[in-house]
Amino acid sequence: MPNAEARRTTPGPLEVVEIERGFLREVGSVFWFIMNTLQESMERVQQGRAPFRAASFFRESVRAGVDSVPLVGLVCFFLGLTMALLTGYQLQRFGTERLIPGLVAIAFTRELGPLITGIMVAARIGAAFTAELGTMQVNEEVEAVEAMGIGPLRFLAAPRMLALFLLAPCLSTVSNLAAVFASSLVCKVYFSIAFPYFLDLVKDSLLIRDIITGILKSFMFGLLIASIACYRGLTVKGGAAGVGTNTTSSVVTAITAVIGFDTVYNVIYTNFYPT
């Protein structure tokens, strides 16, 4: 009986193929959503007119960027404390606690800062975008926008996508600074590393390409999260239940996309810059 249950629960070749097709279909849908939004916006620009209202862009920028600073800063501050403490005690056993500042700075600037920020933004802002646009879709407000001759992609999706695309690196910078500041406190209190010496160690360890890597990741994470959230919101079906389903799917998909893109980027990066 257990073997029979195992055979029933193990996905067959056809099920695996369907999963792969569904994955590729989702990737293609989001890609074309980005392309169509860009095309619709550029057509408006070529006509000499703004693709969306400036007020909409600034409103979304405040919500996605400024309002997210306390959350991002606080979470990464605690992570910086934890990382400095755990790595510090291990390094102290070998007399290499001076490596703590560089370790934390590189880890957050190149990897943890953009990644943690992307996950938090996907959970907070991505869910809000999907729920908001999904409610508009259910209430037929999107159809009303189309009936007035206004493209919903450039009017509703473009300002959200641009705001998160531009603000994600700023939030990542906040997370990096919060983590490094937290680690400086740990180094001062527990390992007797003065702040000026701490800064010297950070500057000696951190490279320009580490900073550029983190910024590029943040740009892509912001674009992915906003695109997935807006796409899920504008394709809601089934009333209020559909809004909830698509909101959950948006968060899960965005977080998975962020981690997946980060993994692919790191594999490519290490092949070109192995040291």
Q: What is each stretch, according to the model?
A:
Residues 9-57, 232-233, 237:
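Short, membrane-interfacial amphipathic segments enriched in basic
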Residues 60-116:
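Active-site cofactor/substrate anionic-group-binding motifs, chiefly glycine-
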Residues 65, 69, 73, 112, ...:
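Selective transmembrane-helix segments that form parts of the transport pathway or gating/packing helices
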Residues 77, 81, 119, 123, ...:
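Hydrophobic positions within alpha-helical transmembrane segments of bacterial inner-membrane proteins
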Residues 85-109, 176-219, 223, 227-249, ...:
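Membrane-interfacial helix-loop-helix connectors in multipass membrane proteins
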Residues 100-139, 143, 228:
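Hydrophobic alpha-helical transmembrane segments of multi-pass membrane transport proteins
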Residues 132-161, 240-243:
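Short cytoplasmic-facing helical segments at TM-TM junctions of multi-pass membrane proteins
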Residues 243, 250-267:
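Final/C-terminal transmembrane alpha-helix of multipass membrane proteins
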